[in-house]
Regions:
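Non-catalytic signal-transmission and effector/linker regions of two-component phosphorelay proteins
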Residues: 1-10, 123-126, 130-133
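Two-component/phosphorelay signaling modules centered on CheY-like receiver
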Residues: 15-34
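Alpha4 helix (beta4-alpha4-beta5 surface) of REC/receiver domains from two-component response regulators
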Residues: 23, 67, 89-104, 114
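Acidic catalytic/metal-coordinating carboxylates
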Residues: 37-41, 64-70
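Active-site beta3 strand of CheY-like receiver
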Residues: 49-56
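Receiver (REC) domain active-site loop signature in two-component systems and cognate sites
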Residues: 60
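C-terminal output helix
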Residues: 110-123
Length: 133
């Protein structure tokens, strides 16, 4: 992926180690990465400059990933942003995220090959939706 084609991904997680690890993996694949430590900061960043994709932890204090997803999908001023929720393996509410507008989810512990496949598929979908018919 050339620098002019680099897609920007916003990673949202309340755990610093998770942010650092995901940032390193995504940057190694050639993506531009922006980070947010909570849902409120993520919404502010999205409204200021919508990313190409959102990688969003489902369980965070104050505003969880489900609420962030709901607010993004209700905001008609925002362009389409693919949302991948990161859920704990025991999270029985993963389907709730899809119902609220998330496009996909991945369970912890994260398989990074699977993560990259899902990221690429979501970005392809966005490109197809944005291309002239």
């Amino acid at each position: 992926m050339s620098p002019t084609q680099a897609k920007r991904i916003l990673v949202v997680d309340d755990i610093e180690d998770n942010l650092s690890l995901l940032e390193a993996v995504l940057m190694e694949e050639g993506y531009e990465v922006d980070l947010a430590k909570n849902g409120e900061l993520a919404l502010a960043k999205i409204e200021a400059s919508p990313p190409d994709l959102l990688l969003l932890d489902a369980m965070m204090p104050k505003m969880n990933g489900y609420e962030v997803t709901r607010r993004i999908r209700q905001n008609k001023r925002l362009p389409f942003i693919p949302i991948l929720l990161i859920t704990a393996s025991e999270d029985a509410n993963a389907a709730q995220g899809l119902d609220l507008g998330a496009n996909d989810f991945i369970r912890k512990p994260i398989d990074f090959d699977e993560l990259m496949a899902r990221v690429k598929a979501s970005l392809r979908l966005k490109d197809m939706m944005n291309s002239p018919q």
